[in-house]
Structures are given as C-alpha cells and as structure tokens.
UniProtKB/Swiss-Prot annotation:
Listed SMART domains: PLDc
UniProt xrefs under Pfam families: PLDc, PLDc_3
Assigned GO CC terms: host cell endoplasmic reticulum membrane; membrane; viral envelope; virion membrane
Name this protein carries in UniProt: Envelope protein F13 homolog
Domain of life of the organism encoding this protein: Viruses
Species annotation: Molluscum contagiosum virus subtype 2
Cross-referenced PANTHER family: GM01519P-RELATED, PHOSPHOLIPASE D - RELATED
C-alpha cells in the first residue's frame, strides 16, 4: 500500500481473558487480562490513564483486587485518571470518590458535532506514555474473569504517546470544551506506521486531518485481501440506527461479498452467540453463509460459552487478513458503532504477530464451543416442460 514505517518495533503481546468454563490454551508468550492490568499498575510511576465504557470492578473478586491496586497507586502519589461513558452506572464511584490523585470523569459522546447520542466504547490503558493495553476488556470484573476478551499489550513508547493523545482529547470532551480545542493529532496512521502498527478511530468527528477512520482502515485491508479473511466478533450489522430512523450501511458487507465472489478469498466469520444477539446481525451473517456455494468459500460459525449467565460472552473483536494484517478493537462491524460511538482500534501488519492472532482465531474456530450454521436446503431441480 505504499506505507512509510518508522523503525521502532511495536513489540506486541496478545492479552486474553479465558473464562474457567472455556478450557482453551493461552497462546505462547501471551498474558491474561488480569495479569496485564496488574503489570501496568505495578510499572506505572507517574501517570495511569484508563478509558472504558464503565467502571464496575467489584463484580468479581479479581476485579475487586484490580480496584484496590488502583486505589493504592493513587494514594502512592501517582496520577490515575479514569474516563467512562456519561450513561454508564457509577458502580464503583463511591470507592473512587475523594481519593487523592484519582480523577473519575464522564464523557458525553453526544457533545460531538451533530449532537447524535452515542457511547464511549474505547477500552485502553496508557502507563507513563511508555506502555499500553488496548482491546475488548472494559474496566469490569467480568472482563477480567468471566467474559472472553482479546487485547494487545505493548511497550512501544511512540505508540503509547500516540494513544495518550486520544485520551487527552477525551479529557477535554469531559470538560465540555469545544471541538476546536481538540488537537485530533497523530503521528501514525494508515500510510505512516510505527513498527507496522497504528491506531484508527471513530466516529469521524474525532478524526481530524491525520487520523484514520476505523472503517477506512478495515476496508482498505479487506479490499486488498488476496487469500483469506477471518473475523471473530459479536455482531455484524449493516445498519446505522438513529432514534427515529434506520439506514442501510452496505460498505463492509459488500466488501466482504466482493472479496469472496470476485477474488476467490476465503471468508470465515465466527460470531458470538448470547441472549442479546442482534437479530439483524444474525440475519446478515446467515445471508453471507448462504452465499457460500459454488466457488464462493464463505462459512459462518457461532461461538457459545457453555452455561453462560448474564454477560458471559465471547467478546473477542478480531480481524485477520492473509495472516499479514490484524485489527483488534472493542467495537463490532456495525454501522451505528462507526457513526455514533467513540473508540480506538489497534492495527498491525507485523507478520509474526499477525500469524499468532491467526492461530488464535483457528483455535477458536476449531474448538468444541464453535458450531456451524446450518445451510438452507437446496431447491428441488426445476421440472423441464417441453413446448410442443
């Protein structure tokens, strides 16, 4: 794609939450989410920044321990700032209130231009502008212990500083400052990467002139796919929903279909199944699955956690293209997510890391917790009528 790349390696590690009910093997050299968060707290010396939809750590013992570690860190004269969505419940607010050096802020995505309601979906940590975590594990006890989650840990300081810029913009939005006060800057993007890695953002009102819109990052690689596209996610919804309208959003759906039908790319989708599965997502992936006939190599499987209760789901959000490019996020392929919600995703074209995440997808795809969607029965051959 004609990219410029800085010499700094991203040095990424896979981070996962694997519930006890999922006896899956953790990839070699990877970290558990609990250990990753604990490590970030231990390594921080001056500043720890955390963005998450909500803060509900006390819902599990492991989460409660992380909360205690954060409180201890703040009391040790380290600045801790937690930003959550304006609409989220203040489950841990009482414990966080009045702690020296700790700020608990709320961000209203509806303050962005256009005034459309939205949510903060970002889930990332930045420690001392030197190391970071980004993935699908929110600041909740479930994300640490009972919800299958995927993220990335890196000690690449240039990328950590770049992610800290996003956090600074979030802080200013919490202070209800105008958009002109936001820098919306970045050193790295789709055309200029750091160690083959960069961040992409949504919605478009948080892009500015240099950041990469997340949908554009995903589409660029889907449209360039040569052999394989593997996706693991909770939903694929080709719609943008407003309070009073629904609009069709075909960009991603069409790109996937074209890759399979026009370029013979193998497409595999592994979709998390739970009691809140989006009906439009199920319809969309079933439609893709039914296109897997003839030369079109398209298949869809669903991943269900046995005995799952409440929000115990497969919340892994992963895209692997040609075992050469990976995209890790906390957002689904959903038109409303791109149009209304605020999030940051991690993109990487380092082959060793891409292959490791490709192997993780293969593990999940082949596991006993994954089952194929049944295809519709083919129609009976039409009876040929002779015309006399």
């Amino acid at each position: 794609m004609g990219n410029l790349t800085s010499a700094q390696p991203a040095g990424c590690k896979i981070v996962e939450t694997l519930p006890a009910t999922l006896p899956l093997a953790l990839p070699a050299g990877s970290m558990l989410t609990y250990d990753c968060f604990d490590t970030l707290i231990s390594q921080t010396q001056s500043e720890l920044c955390i963005a998450s939809y909500c803060c509900n750590l006390r819902s599990t013992p492991e989460g409660g321990h992380v909360l205690l570690r954060l409180l201890e860190l703040a009391r040790a004269n380290v600045r801790v700032t937690i930003i959550v969505d304006e609409q989220s419940r203040d489950a841990d607010a009482t414990q966080l209130a009045g702690v020296p050096n700790l700020r608990y802020l709320k961000m209203d995505v509806g303050e962005l231009p256009g005034g459309k309601p939205g949510s903060l979906l970002s889930s990332f940590w930045v420690s001392d502008k030197r190391r970071f975590y980004l993935g699908s594990a929110s600041l909740t006890g479930g994300s640490i212990s009972t919800i299958k989650s995927l993220g990335v840990y890196s000690e690449c300081a240039p990328l950590a500083r770049d992610l800290r810029r996003r956090f600074r913009d979030y802080e200013r939005l919490c202070a209800r400052r105008c958009l002109r006060c936001l820098s919306l800057s970045t050193r790295f993007h789709l055309r200029r990467r750091c160690g083959d890695a960069f961040f992409s953002d949504a919605p478009e009102s948080l892009i500015g002139s240099t950041r990469t819109f997340d949908a554009d990052a995903v589409l660029a690689h889907v449209q360039a796919a040569r052999s394989t596209i593997d996706m693991e996610l909770l939903s694929l919804v080709p719609l943008v929903r407003d309070e009073d309208s629904v609009k069709y959003w075909p960009r991603m759906h069409d790109a996937l279909v074209r890759a399979a039908l026009e370029r013979n790319v193998r497409l595999r989708l592994l979709v998390g199944l739970w009691h809140r599965s989006d009906v439009f997502s199920l319809a969309a992936v079933k439609g893709l699955h039914e296109l897997g006939v003839g030369h079109a190599d398209i298949s869809v499987r669903v991943f269900a956690i046995p005995g799952a209760k409440g929000d115990a789901i497969n919340n892994t959000k992963l895209l692997v293209v040609d075992d050469e490019y990976v995209h890790v996020s906390n957002a689904d392929i959903d038109g409303t997510h791109y149009a209304r919600h605020a999030f940051v995703s991690f993109n990487c074209a380092e082959r060793t890391f891409a292959r490791a995440l490709g192997a993780l997808f293969e593990r999940d795809w082949q596991s006993s917790f994954s089952s194929p969607l049944p295809r519709a029965l083919p129609p009976e051959p039409a009876t040929l009528l002779s015309v006399n």
